[in-house]
């Protein structure tokens, strides 16, 4: 994982975990790597990983079973999706609309491009 200098590492780790949950790589109820395992694999201090896990725990995305480890919480996908939708709509989407207006791009243009994107497969 390559880290962005402009965003705290613990938040980047939390984002990566959320992406794994959203894509189904880590399904709800599954055990995730321990703080130590994650720290070793990412080559970061375990305290940084612990901060990520604490953040995600406080949001109800993961939970700790004492002595066993951390697990993806039931409903985690919905929590993540709702949080990311809100962030997208209040931030990124406003910027997209602003650029569309400046560049003269219509909703119909975007709709057409979106349907082409979906029909080709969104994984490209």
Question: Language-model segments: which ranges?
Answer:
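Extreme N-terminal segment that seeds HTH/winged-HTH DNA-binding domains in transcriptional regulators
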Residues: 1-31, 37, 87, 91-123
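Beta-hairpin "wing" of winged helix-turn-helix
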Residues: 25-26, 30, 58-67, 71-74
């Amino acid at each position: 994982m390559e880290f962005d200098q402009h965003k705290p590492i613990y938040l980047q780790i939390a984002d990566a975990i959320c992406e794994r949950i959203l894509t189904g790589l880590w399904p709800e109820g599954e055990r995730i790597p321990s703080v130590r395992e994650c720290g070793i694999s990412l080559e970061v201090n375990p305290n940084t990983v612990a901060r990520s896990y604490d953040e995600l725990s406080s949001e109800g995305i993961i939970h700790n079973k004492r002595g066993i480890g951390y697990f993806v919480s039931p409903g985690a996908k919905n929590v993540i999706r709702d949080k990311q939708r809100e962030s997208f709509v209040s931030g990124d989407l406003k910027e997209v609309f602003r650029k569309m207006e400046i560049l003269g791009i219509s909703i119909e243009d975007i709709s057409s491009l979106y349907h082409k994107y979906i029909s080709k497969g969104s994984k490209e």
